[in-house]
Regions:
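Bacterial N-terminal signal peptides that target proteins for export
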Residues: 1-10
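Sec/Tat signal peptide C-region and signal peptidase I cleavage site
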Residues: 20-24
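Sequence context surrounding c-type heme c attachment/ligation sites in exported
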Residues: 25-30, 37, 41-65, 83-172
């Protein structure tokens, strides 16, 4: 049986989108109120699982992850209109899973164990020193350590300064 590239992509996206149980514990309603990221104070937004799909991503070794990026309505409107910089109130959420081979179809990769929920929040006044963005990286619903958060803005600044510090583009 021949599978088209778009068919494989659709299968991957459906697998990622249906992986809700892996991240159920990461939603704000299940995390303590104090579960805010160091430096930025970002929390996992309530209801993010209902937000629109922005794009998939794949991270090579050493992380070896499958990722999906979701955007709130403010992000989606900006992306659809190619608006830069993103307006205040824009929020991206990236969900990541370990990539594992499919047991049903060898060439395909499917989501394995959930690894992180990563959040970017645009507030140009509050996050003036980081290009207007606050960052949060969460593992099992809890913020990652300070050291991980200290690298967020530097990485975005070095690579995507000309795209309002955002790597993600709207998938066609």
């Amino acid at each position: 049986v021949k599978c088209s590239r778009s068919g494989l992509a659709a299968t991957l996206l459906l697998s990622l989108a249906s992986a809700t149980p892996s991240f159920a514990a990461n939603e704000t309603r299940d995390a303590p109120a104090q579960a805010a990221s160091p430096i930025y104070g970002v929390t996992i937004p309530h209801g993010y699982r209902t937000w629109q799909f922005v794009a998939p991503a794949e991270e090579a070794d050493p992380l070896d992850e499958l990722r999906i990026v979701l955007g709130n309505p403010t992000v989606m409107k900006a992306l659809e209109k190619n608006t830069l910089p993103f307006p205040d109130g824009s929020i991206f959420v990236k969900l990541a899973w370990k990539r594992v081979p499919s047991t049903e179809f060898g060439p395909a990769s499917v989501p394995g164990a959930a690894t992180t929920v990563q959040v970017m929040v645009k507030d140009s006044k509050r996050y003036r020193d980081s290009g207007g963005w606050g960052f949060g990286r969460f593992i099992n619903g809890q913020p990652a350590d300070l050291a991980q958060h200290q690298t967020c803005f530097a990485c975005h600044q070095a690579r995507v300064r000309n795209h309002d510090f955002v790597f993600t583009r709207l998938a066609p």
